[in-house]
Regions:
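Terminal or standalone catalytic/regulatory effector modules within metabolic enzymes
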Residues: 1-173
Length: 173
């Protein structure tokens, strides 16, 4: 696959592979590549905000989400409502980090085939002129969407730090 990983990152990749084997009957190289890109490489290049857990509820025309994040060792949980589970999850994450970037684009596609396929979500975010994209992958499209948004938020943190820009909000920086 062409990845060059440290021993620590290789151990993380093996853990992801084992988890994927528990979820899927057949694991392909495309599955593994999508998960490594989502879980390891994206996290290595940005601030460490990671998903600990999520719970969504869906009803006709609305959804709610409770999100728990690890923000550099600090656990934070919040809940929000939206016009679907992804919107609600994004609102809850934004409440935790203290700002809500504009969602300029959102897409999801199947990386692999079958009912237990890996879904890859992509987002394009804009906050005060800082434009980033985020990616996430999972066998659960809600989780893939949440991971993509978190990846985008992490990239906003990194870009803001590189440009010396302070992101606003109670937990922004």
């Amino acid at each position: 696959m062409g990845f060059s990983l440290s021993e620590e990152k290789l151990a993380e990749a093996m853990a992801i592979f084992k988890d994927l084997c528990d979820r899927k009957e057949i694991v392909t190289s495309d599955d593994l590549e999508a998960m490594i890109n989502s879980e390891i490489l994206s996290a290595a290049e940005s601030r460490k905000i990671t998903l600990k857990s999520f719970l969504v509820q869906v009803g006709e025309g609305h959804g709610t989400a409770t999100i728990t994040l690890d923000d550099d060792g600090r656990e934070a949980t919040d809940a929000a409502a939206g016009n679907g589970p992804v919107d609600a999850a994004y609102r809850a994450i934004s409440r935790i980090v203290g700002f809500e970037p504009e969602l300029e684009d959102y897409s999801i596609r199947s990386v692999t085939e079958d009912t237990d396929a890996i879904g890859e979500a992509r987002v394009a975010l804009n906050l005060a002129g800082l434009k980033v994209s985020g990616r996430g992958a999972s066998t659960d499209i809600i989780e893939a969407s949440i991971r993509a948004y978190i990846d985008g938020i992490n990239r906003l943190f990194r870009m803001a730090a590189l440009k010396g820009v302070r992101l606003y909000g109670k937990n922004a920086g």
